[in-house]
Amino acid sequence: YNSPSLDDGTIAYHRVFGVVTANSYWYFSSKQLEQDIIAAENNPQISAHLLHINSPGGEAWYMDRLSETLRSAKKPIIAIYEEYCASAAYYIGCHGQKLYATTNHDFVGCIGTMCSFWNFEPYFEKLGLKKIVAKATNSSRKNKIFEDLKDGKSEDYIKNVLDPMNEQFLAEVKAMRSKLSELGD
């Protein structure tokens, strides 16, 4: 994106495929997209950004920074959705001044925040594996929020982790897609 040999009017192509992660060397990375947007913004030969999105979503980490960068972009952003543009992918795509789905069957939306994981401890115990945890004297609350979540007590995790991310996500979508702010929850 920062090559001086690009033709004037070049459109920066940004591929958002697969699961959204903050860090990845092999797949999509929201941190890398932010760097690419900044580089394209600084290249006078580039006239616009094209976000090509096919993603079911992914993690919310770093989305606030990426949203700031997309919101502050001076060059137009066009988003094309192919098959899926859901959850964290929609968080990215909602920044387009123009949004296009490739077919009437593309899945767009799924605005919300959740966490899911598998608890393999009972399976490991059947195999004879036992988890051993040692905590420093002054670290009795270390990872308590995750231990509570694993034990079916999700209230603190929802209140302190998911709800703040969800509020940020909803506020960004409503700010970028003003017609959606008129819709009910």
Predicted regions and their residues:
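Small-residue-centered hinge/linker elements
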Residues: 1-75, 84, 88-177
